[in-house]
């Protein structure tokens, strides 16, 4: 091979490498631009855009909001804040006495109509769903909040999970959510169609997701899977109902003080139900921390930033995040078992 031929080959290799470098550079610029735009959207959604006006969902016009799991925690706070916005309410939960107390509180404070239904959704009886149908048959409903949910009593390996706990989680988080939505969503479609002729009212379906569904969670495997299912189901439903002027949103939360989380004190990362619901209703229809996900929102600012960092660095399905999650819940399990052992000794 002559010197000129060698020089020519070297030039061709250089052009090839140079082209590859430009491709890498272009992809890097695209990634940085996308990341920057997502971060700006995060900031706008969380802090700069005004609060959502619920008049478009029928607030103060006699329309009803149906809330499941409404007697405690996040569900109870949804009831309070939706009543404050002027919605009549249908509250569904297990404990009659708690529902009656909340009914009186909301009717006295906000002068709205509050209907209550006490059923145990874990029983998965047809009569439960018939009761919901009868109660809601003649009501102009525009909003549904699928809040009812259940987790494990403590973190537990899947192979040691009791069958009843496993079945209850799937029944409450998935089966009941789907069946109740099948009952209420047609009522929302009907109400919106009737109202659109006059006022352009929209419908809204909110479903509580979880970081447990966002990130695979060892030692909470059944709960994690049930919430991950809701992500795909809710996104699919959003695509189906958009033509009917119904907004469907999955709400992702990290820890919130509640009886289910067993956390009593709030902190920077752990809001109380009032703070969490306020941030949710302020930002309905905005992705906040879920910038890469359709029809999904992570509304509380600390949760949103946490999700953004995980998503844009390691990724929610990475081994390192899975391992960290496992260690975190393993430590919770150890503490819970020690506490249970101490209580047994006292007895």
UniProtKB/Swiss-Prot annotation:
Pathway: Lipid metabolism; fatty acid biosynthesis. Its main location: endoplasmic reticulum. Gene3D superfamilies: NAD(P)-binding Rossmann-like Domain. It is found in: Endoplasmic reticulum membrane. GO terms for molecular function: ketoreductase activity; very-long-chain 3-oxoacyl-CoA reductase activity. It is an enzyme of class 1 (oxidoreductase). Keywords: Endoplasmic reticulum, Fatty acid biosynthesis, Fatty acid metabolism, Lipid biosynthesis, Lipid metabolism, Membrane, NADP, Oxidoreductase, Transmembrane, Transmembrane helix. The chain crosses the membrane at residues 20-40. Interacts with the fatty acid elongation system components ELO3 and TSC13. Component of the microsomal membrane bound fatty acid elongation system, which produces the 26-carbon very long-chain fatty acids (VLCFA) from palmitate. Catalyzes the reduction of the 3-ketoacyl-CoA intermediate that is formed in each cycle of fatty acid elongation. VLCFAs serve as precursors for ceramide and sphingolipids. This is Very-long-chain 3-oxoacyl-CoA reductase. It comes from Saccharomyces cerevisiae (strain YJM789) (Baker's yeast).
């Amino acid at each position: 091979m002559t010197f000129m031929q060698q020089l020519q080959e070297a030039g061709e290799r250089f052009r090839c490498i140079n082209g590859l470098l430009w491709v890498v550079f272009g992809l890097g610029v695209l990634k940085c631009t996308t990341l920057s735009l997502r971060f700006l959207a995060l900031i706008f959604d969380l802090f700069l855009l005004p609060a959502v006006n619920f008049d478009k969902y029928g607030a103060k016009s006699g329309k009803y909001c149906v809330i499941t799991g409404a007697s405690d925690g996040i569900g109870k706070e949804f009831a309070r804040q939706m009543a404050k916005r002027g919605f009549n309410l249908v509250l569904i939960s297990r404990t009659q006495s708690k529902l009656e107390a909340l009914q009186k509180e909301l009717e006295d404070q906000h002068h709205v109509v509050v209907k209550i239904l006490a059923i145990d959704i874990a029983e998965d009886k047809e009569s439960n769903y018939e009761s919901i149908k009868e109660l809601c048959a003649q009501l102009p409903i525009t909003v549904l909040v699928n809040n009812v949910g259940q987790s494990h009593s403590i973190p537990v390996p899947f192979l040691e999970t009791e069958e009843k706990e496993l079945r209850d989680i799937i029944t409450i988080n998935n089966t009941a959510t789907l069946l109740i939505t099948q009952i209420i969503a047609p009522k929302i479609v009907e109400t919106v169609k009737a109202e659109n002729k006059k006022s352009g009212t929209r419908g809204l379906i909110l479903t509580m997701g979880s970081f447990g569904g966002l990130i695979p969670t060892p030692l909470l495997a059944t709960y994690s899977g049930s919430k991950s299912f809701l992500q795909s189901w809710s996104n699919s439903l959003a695509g189906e109902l958009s033509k009917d002027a119904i907004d469907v949103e999955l709400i992702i939360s990290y820890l919130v003080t509640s009886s289910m989380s067993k956390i009593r004190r709030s902190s920077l990362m752990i809001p109380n139900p009032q703070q969490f619901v306020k941030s949710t209703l302020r930002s309905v229809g905005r992705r906040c921390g879920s910038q890469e996900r359709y029809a999904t929102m992570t509304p509380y600012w600390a949760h949103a930033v946490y999700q953004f960092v995980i998503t844009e660095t390691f990724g929610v399905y990475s081994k390192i995040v899975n391992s960290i999650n496992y260690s975190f819940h393993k430590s919770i399990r150890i503490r819970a078992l020690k506490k249970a052992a101490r209580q047994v000794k006292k007895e």
